[in-house]
Amino acid sequence: MTDNYCFTSLRINSKPKWISGRGCPTFYSKFSNYSADYVNKLYNMVRRQSNAPFFCFTDDSDGIDSNINVVEIDVSQYLYWNNWWPAWCKILLYNRKELDQFYKKIFFDLDTIIHGDITPIIEHDDNFSLVYSKWRGLPYKMQNPHKSMYNSSCIVWKNNKPIYDYWMKNPRGYVERYMGTDDFYHTEKIKRTAL
């Protein structure tokens, strides 16, 4: 089954209309300024190692390479939520029909730089895995015991519909309670393994 996989990325350029709670508008705009060039570069880095289909879920497809499977998504319903930011859209990928045909999905953040062999990621066979943030180290963990040591800059999953369904029970509440998907997975005790 390792040959039935795809790569995904997410580009959201819509910015929240109402910003409060964090006190720093740049916190939000930082995640909304990735140009199509980021998508194209990530695609080319992946393409050097795999010919698997590559999807970009986006609200702005201008300038994206025509070889990429672009899927337009609408995030307008979230733009007025307190503490919403584009990283939350990663959870929406778990319920996308476009990905159902693939046994395994591999997601990379757009600012990911691939400079090594990704075969171990492609061959990773757990149901849901995130990057384990070894670089944060023990001092970080000791100072932030409530924070996750996992990072969603790379996600490998087979079927995360149960996570999507769980999130949909109270999406606005989770968005207002957590700093993003990493804290959501950690605090809500979503079962995951390390990449």
Task: Locate the predicted segments by residue.
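N-terminal anchoring/stem segment of glycosyltransferases
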Residues: M1-Y80, L99-Q101
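Soluble or luminal CAZymes and related metallo-dependent hydrolases
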Residues: Y34-K41, P86-C89, E176-T181
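GT-A fold catalytic core of metal-dependent nucleotide-sugar glycosyltransferases
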Residues: V70-E72, P86-L138, W157
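Short, P/G- and charge-enriched loop/turn segments at secondary-structure junctions
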Residues: Y80-W81, P139-P145
